[in-house]
């Protein structure tokens, strides 16, 4: 009898909390969710020397954040630093760091802690793409993809998460990819690294949830191709439904998701529907849709930036 009462109580609590969370989600779907103030927050952005990382730095500069910029490209990173100051940032710190090297990450992280303070918003943005078919891709390039696109997240989390937990305040941002949701022809190593980054960020979020560390937020971003040069030459078969994203639009959406403490951000919105279809459609139907949207041959025109130099 007592077992039945206990089970019933547990069920009612579960149903009540579930209903409340659904109602809350519906309300915020209709009304704008409040945005948090990031003025004075120490924001670390990896891969800040160009592309998406640079644009993210400029957005946070306008919001009054303290910027910590990491990139392996010293010249590009210093240029971003200069642009951030021109955009209104009063405190900007640029560090040359190869995020693929664990020892280097830990060394520069210690510098940041001593010279700037505890990072409260960590944006793992640094990424590389080889754009080669699996059997054509040298082992060292595949290893480099994993080192930059995934393993760097392990080292930066290890370096900065403890202080966030101690302060019960922090935000972990993973820039994954639509290629971290579904396999793509010509991107085997990239997809694998982005799947890993997604799964890692989600798992650490679950750890913080179970440990009731409510002050630690997570945002996982999965965009389709962005016009930053990284995927130059890539195409889409249906631009009206699945466009290659403009960098300004992508950055605005990413920053908005961070300010609203949104867990998942897929861009464009069609990706949410595509992931839903993938869960139940027959394989052949899914492949037909991918072919229609041009996804199966999106990488055919890819231009390797290293070959251009």
UniProtKB/Swiss-Prot annotation:
A GO cellular component annotation in the UniProt record: chromatin
InterPro entries associated with the record: NAD(P)-bd_dom_sf, SDR_fam
EC number(s) per entry: 1.1.1.105
Tissue: Detected in adult lung. Detected at low levels in adult brain, heart, testis, placenta, cervix, pancreas, uterus, stomach, rectum, small intestine, colon, esophagus, thymus, skin, and skin keratinocyte. Expression is higher in psoriasis lesions relative to unaffected skin from psoriasis patients. Detected in fetal kidney, skin and lung.
CDD domains attached to this UniProt entry: 17beta-HSDXI-like_SDR_c
Protein's UniProt keywords contain Magnesium: no
Gene Ontology biological process terms, A to Z: keratinocyte proliferation; negative regulation of gene expression, epigenetic; negative regulation of transcription by RNA polymerase II; retinal metabolic process; retinol metabolic process
Recorded superkingdom: Eukaryota
Keywords: Endoplasmic reticulum, Membrane, NAD, NADP, Oxidoreductase, Transmembrane, Transmembrane helix
Catalytic activity line of the entry: all-trans-retinol--[retinol-binding protein] + NAD(+) = all-trans-retinal--[retinol-binding protein] + NADH + H(+)
Protein family: Belongs to the short-chain dehydrogenases/reductases (SDR) family.
Name of the protein described by the UniProt record: Epidermal retinol dehydrogenase 2
Organism: Homo sapiens
């Amino acid at each position: 009898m007592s077992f039945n009462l206990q089970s019933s109580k547990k069920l009612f609590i579960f149903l009540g909390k579930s209903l409340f969370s659904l109602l809350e989600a519906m309300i915020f779907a209709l009304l704008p969710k409040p945005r948090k103030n990031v003025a004075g927050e120490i924001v670390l952005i990896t891969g800040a020397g160009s592309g998406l990382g640079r644009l993210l730095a400029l957005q946070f500069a306008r919001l009054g954040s303290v910027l910590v910029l990491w990139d392996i490209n010293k010249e590009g990173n210093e240029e971003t630093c200069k642009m951030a100051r021109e955009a209104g940032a009063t405190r900007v710190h640029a560090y040359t760091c190869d995020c693929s090297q664990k020892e280097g990450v830990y060394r520069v992280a210690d510098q940041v802690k001593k010279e700037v303070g505890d990072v409260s918003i960590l944006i793992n943005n640094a990424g590389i793409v080889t754009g080669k078919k699996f059997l054509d891709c040298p082992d060292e390039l595949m290893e480099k993809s994993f080192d930059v696109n995934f393993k760097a997240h392990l080292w930066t989390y290890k370096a900065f998460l403890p202080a966030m937990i101690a302060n019960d305040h922090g935000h972990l941002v993973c820039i994954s990819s639509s290629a971290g949701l579904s396999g793509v022809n010509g991107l085997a190593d990239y997809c694998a690294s982005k799947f890993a980054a997604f799964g890692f960020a989600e798992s650490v979020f679950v750890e913080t949830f179970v440990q009731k560390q409510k002050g630690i937020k997570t945002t996982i971003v999965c965009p389709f191709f962005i016009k930053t040069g990284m995927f130059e030459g890539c195409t889409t078969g249906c631009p009206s439904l699945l466009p290659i994203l403009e960098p300004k639009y992508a950055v605005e959406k990413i920053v908005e998701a961070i300010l609203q403490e949104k867990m998942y951000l897929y861009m464009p919105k069609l990706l949410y529907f595509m992931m839903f279809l993938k869960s139940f459609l027959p394989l052949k139907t899914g492949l037909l849709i991918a072919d229609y949207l041009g996804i199966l041959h999106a990488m055919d025109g890819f231009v390797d930036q290293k070959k251009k130099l």
